[in-house]
From Swiss-Prot:
Statement: the UniProt record of this protein carries the keyword Secreted: yes
Entry protein name: Beta-defensin 129
Function description: Has antibacterial activity.
Keywords associated with the record: Antibiotic, Antimicrobial, Defensin, Disulfide bond, Secreted, Signal
Disulfide bridge map: C27-C53, C34-C48, C38-C54
Gene transcribed to yield this protein: DEFB129
Amino acid sequence: MKLLFPIFASLMLQYQVNTEFIGLRSCLMGFGRCRDHCNVDEKEIQKCKMKKCCVGPKVVKLIKNYLQYGTPNVLNEDVQEMLKPAENSSAVIQRKHILSILPQIKSINFFANTNLVIIPNATPVNSATVSTMTSGQITYTATSAKSNTKESGDSATASPPPAPPPPNILPTPSLELEEAEEQ
């Protein structure tokens, strides 16, 4: 029993346990199930080896809503027209369309910006910061800087750092009143 408990506990605490031996293999990042035949209300999205990846109507609605309202400024007009609900649309056309759009969404860089950093008594330094955000993954930030180190080194040694200001005690009205009362 002492030997079985750590093995059982490690299986229960794993992030993702392979449940293929039970027959409940999942697909489409856990939103779908691999089955021989899809139910009436489910749609086939991908293939799981010899089976079909079936997703329910809630997942299909979630994907459509995300593509329609979550990314309207990223996608071009042709894709937006295809996403509008149609009365005579078949499951095959929808599946091909959804799978063709996903690589476009992944390839777009949402968070790219370029800044200009200015250091006093030195030359300007151009820096570009690019960070990408992917759901469920760690965000990495890369910064590249370009400057002339000889010029900035010369300018840094040419001017000494400014001396700190001398400590001045500023007279306050209450201090002036006390001095006037003493006299």
